[in-house]
Amino acid sequence: DGNRGQANYAASKAGIIGLTKSVAKELGSRGICCNAIAPGLIETDMTGGMTDNEEVLAHIPLARPGKPEEVAMLAAFLAESDYITGEVIRIDGGMTL
């Protein structure tokens, strides 16, 4: 989903999705998996004051921002998996439901 004034950001996200699926198909026969992680609102220096904004949190069913450690745990899980490939996995507390 695009937002006004963010065409470049939306295009880059679409590019990552296409690249992920293409690489998964091209390298799967060699046993190489390729996936993408699509984080939602995660507590970082970049997200600053957004993580305690009630209006923003109201759009997240789990009613809180994610933690960097949670994204890292997903990355570690995918690194261990030998049978997940070509997937874009959202970690956003249900924000995109």
Predicted regions and their residues:
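Conserved active-site motif detector
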Residues: 3
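Cytosolic ligand/metal-binding cores
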Residues: 7
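Active-site helix of classical SDR
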Residues: 12, 20
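Short, flexible catalytic-loop segment of classical short-chain dehydrogenase/reductase
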Residues: 17, 38-49
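Alpha-helical segment proximal to the catalytic Tyr-Lys
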Residues: 25-29
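Conserved SDR Rossmann-fold cofactor-binding beta-strand/turn motif
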Residues: 33-39, 43, 90-92
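Catalytic Tyr-x(3-8)-Lys segment
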Residues: 52-70
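C-terminal substrate-recognition "lid" of short-chain dehydrogenase/reductases
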Residues: 67-91, 96
